Amino acid sequence: MTKFQNFYSPNFDQIKRRSSNIKYLIYHYTGMESERSALKRLCDTKSKVSCHYFIKKNGKILQIVPDSYISWHAGKSCWKKDKMLNKSSIGIEIHNSGHNFNYTNFNKNQIISIKNLSNVLIKKYRIKKVMI
């Protein structure tokens, strides 16, 4: 079983969605120097950005927004006929400093956590592999 901690962000649509609407997993990396600065941004109402899950460097998983709500991670997006993918996806941020701060590969703990979390979400929401 994949365990995670709750870490609240106010940045999400207040209307609940049905689980049957979830059909995509979208992965991002933070591109910020520290986990602290990334989490601060994800929780700052001025930033208007969030995600459902955040994978820390040590592999710990934080749930930022409950799955039943729409987080703000995909912006103005589309895939095939679907538009505004925030409505139909789970957003997962993996902490990585990115190209501006000496990019490094994702570490073993992060990879294990993302695989485990993804497997849980794929099974729970019946997400097709081509929708990841």
Task: Set out the residue ranges of the language-model regions.
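Active-site-adjacent loop/helix surface patches within enzyme catalytic domains
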Residues: 2-128
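Acidic helix-start/capping segments at beta-turn-to-alpha-helix junctions
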Residues: 131-132
